[in-house]
Amino acid sequence: MEHFDASLSTYFKALLGPRDTRVKGWFLLDNYIPTFICSVIYLLIVWLGPKYMRNKQPFSCRGILVVYNLGLTLLSLYMFCELVTGVWEGKYNFFCQGTRTAGESDMKIIRVLRWYYFSKLIEFMDTFFFILRKNNHQITVLHVYHHASMLNIWWFVMNWVPCGHSYFGATLNSFIHVLMYSYYGLSSVPSMRPYLWWKKYITQGQLLQFVLTIIQTSCGVIWPCTFPLGWLYFQIGYMISLIALFTNFYIQTYNKKGASRRKDHLKDHQNGSVAAVNGHTNSFSPLENNVKPRKLRKD
């Protein structure tokens, strides 16, 4: 294993240049193998988990979901505040910022982005909760691609460009995650669901985040500094892939749902009655044909 790791490190050095020594010896960042193994295990659980749960009752997970989402909300808020203050103290340049120009402020950014990398590992739990609750329709190509790729990308970011221009996307993403995980935490409490109206706008915020990241990254290409250009081109390409997938998700989830509701509403009027829609707006499906809802485990 050590020989393989040494060979891998030599290959990465030839491809990407020398690593940033400021993260040398840091947990999970010294070599790529643990991150790769975690990603493989994640993909195996995505594949095998639904098969294992097929003939089992779904778990509720309500209590642990509240704690989990609250924890990620607070972690995201901490990272956002620390990144903003670090950028302010280091007088970071919006258009392009190198990785060795702000002294101690760079180290502050690096320490926060280490937590950002760890948060991508923690967020694998999003998928595991979907599996345990048998919400398999939420395990989409977008969901798996985003979760699996972010952990791996940020291992490389932390080893080669752990500060400087790398801060912007992580700062925006941390802010979006404050909104997103607070929403998911509140939605875990049934009595709160009727008051949660902003899920649609979270997706819009995510799309705006990607567009702003492309704009800010492009500034580093147009007005270059000491930050490696190859990383900027890669980030632009990755953001484009996320925009394509999130736009498709948005259209499939909201535009088609709205068109379907308008069609059903018109049909109900033509039949001389209007159906109640509270079951849908409150995130519950109405019962039809006297079919009882399946029981959830209270684990």
Curated annotation (Swiss-Prot):
It comes from the Eukaryota. The keyword Transmembrane applies. The modification N-acetylmethionine is found at M1. Pathway: Lipid metabolism; polyunsaturated fatty acid biosynthesis. Residues 279-288 have a biased composition (Polar residues). The modification Phosphoserine is found at S285. It is found in: Endoplasmic reticulum membrane; Cell projection, Dendrite. GO terms for biological process: fatty acid elongation, monounsaturated fatty acid; fatty acid elongation, polyunsaturated fatty acid; fatty acid elongation, saturated fatty acid; long-chain fatty-acyl-CoA biosynthetic process; sphingolipid biosynthetic process; unsaturated fatty acid biosynthetic process; very long-chain fatty acid biosynthetic process. It is an enzyme of class 2 (transferase). Pfam families: ELO (PF01151). Its EC number is 2.3.1.199. GO terms for cellular component: dendrite; dendritic tree; endoplasmic reticulum membrane; neuronal cell body. Disulfide bonds: none annotated. The chain crosses the membrane at residues 26-46, 64-84, 112-132, 150-170, 205-225, 226-246. Its main location: endoplasmic reticulum. It catalyses: a very-long-chain acyl-CoA + malonyl-CoA + H(+) = a very-long-chain 3-oxoacyl-CoA + CO2 + CoA; (6Z,9Z,12Z)-octadecatrienoyl-CoA + malonyl-CoA + H(+) = (8Z,11Z,14Z)-3-oxoeicosatrienoyl-CoA + CO2 + CoA; (9Z,12Z,15Z)-octadecatrienoyl-CoA + malonyl-CoA + H(+) = (11Z,14Z,17Z)-3-oxoeicosatrienoyl-CoA + CO2 + CoA; (9Z)-hexadecenoyl-CoA + malonyl-CoA + H(+) = 3-oxo-(11Z)-octadecenoyl-CoA + CO2 + CoA. It is a multi-pass membrane protein. Residues 275-299 are annotated as: Disordered. The keyword Lipid biosynthesis applies. Interacts with TECR. Belongs to the ELO family. ELOVL5 subfamily. This is Very long chain fatty acid elongase 5. It comes from Macaca fascicularis (Crab-eating macaque). The lineage of its organism: Eukaryota, Metazoa, Chordata, Craniata, Vertebrata. The gene is ELOVL5.
